């Protein structure tokens, strides 16, 4: 198996596909139902993630992205059946709103890429989704139902994926242990707070983040929500407020 990816089993029918050799330590998740499989995020695109997925399942695979930033859609080109939120459709069809060279510089930072990957030829994925997903939609995999939650803030079309029956929340870049990014021009700190308030209402048992450590306890959602609320009360929940450190996580505004 390609050594770019690290494979872990969260459950018998849930596989974590990680890119630990990159500084962002991106995680993608393969959820298998009785009829089809769902791939949440497709990573950086350094190596062909579809080869790994095909070793895991022989069922039809639908790919979704928590949001269409370059580090979450790199493998989308291998999955014609992919979905996105309508708020990010222009980013997929009209060009990504960040200079290519900035992304390339960020891509290679502190990372030894495989010799087979030519960074100079890297292109940000562009394509038309097979379907658009909206808040409240349910993806039925056969014996497993995954609910779409529109959670903007980090990105306009950011989505979390909620498996109510198991209490599993796939949080993308909304929640993880490191520095949350709410400083890009396309981020919205106020929306970020509303999204945290939304997921804080859920009976979450397991958090599956898109980056860094997998040891994320559900209580971090409440702590993040409360921190955002405090910043808003102080008039600091806005771009330009800098980096605020909360111990096991931080926020850059």
Predicted features and spans:
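Metallo-beta-lactamase
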Residues: 37-39, 44-45, 124, 131, ...
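Short glycine/proline-enriched coil/turn segments at helix->beta-strand junctions
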Residues: 34, 57-60, 76-82, 164-166, ...
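Short Pro/Gly-enriched beta-strand edge/turn motifs at strand-loop
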Residues: 9-15, 117-121, 142-144
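Conserved beta-strand hairpin/beta-sheet module of binuclear metal-dependent hydrolase folds
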Residues: 3-55, 160-172, 176
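C-terminal regulatory/interaction regions
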Residues: 235-253
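Active-site HxH/HxHxD metal-binding segment of metal-dependent hydrolases
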Residues: 46-138, 227-237
């Amino acid at each position: 198996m390609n050594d770019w990816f690290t494979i872990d089993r969260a459950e018998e029918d849930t596989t974590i596909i990680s890119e630990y050799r990159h500084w962002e330590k991106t995680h993608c998740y393969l959820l298998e139902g009785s009829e089809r499989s769902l791939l949440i995020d497709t990573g950086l695109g350094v190596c062909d993630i579809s080869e790994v997925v095909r070793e895991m399942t022989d069922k039809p695979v639908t790919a979704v992205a928590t949001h269409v930033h370059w580090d979450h859609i790199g493998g989308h080109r291998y999955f014609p059946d992919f979905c996105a939120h309508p708020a990010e459709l222009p980013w997929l069809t009209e060009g990504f709103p960040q200079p290519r060279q900035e992304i390339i510089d960020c891509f290679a930072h502190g990372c030894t890429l495989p010799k087979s990957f030519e960074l100079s030829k890297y292109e940000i994925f562009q394509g038309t989704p097979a379907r658009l997903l909206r808040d409240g939609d349910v993806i039925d995999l056969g014996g497993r139902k995954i609910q779409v939650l529109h959670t903007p803030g980090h990105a306009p079309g950011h989505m979390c994926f909620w498996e109510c029956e198991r209490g599993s929340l796939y949080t993308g870049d909304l929640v993880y242990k490191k520095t949350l990014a709410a400083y890009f021009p396309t981020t919205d700190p106020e929306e970020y707070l509303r999204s945290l308030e939304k997921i804080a209402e859920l009976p979450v048992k397991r958090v599956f983040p898109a980056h860094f450590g997998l040891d994320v306890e559900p209580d971090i959602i409440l702590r993040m929500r409360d921190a955002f609320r405090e910043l808003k009360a102080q008039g600091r929940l806005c771009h330009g407020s800098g980096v605020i450190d909360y111990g096991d996580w931080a926020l850059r505004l």
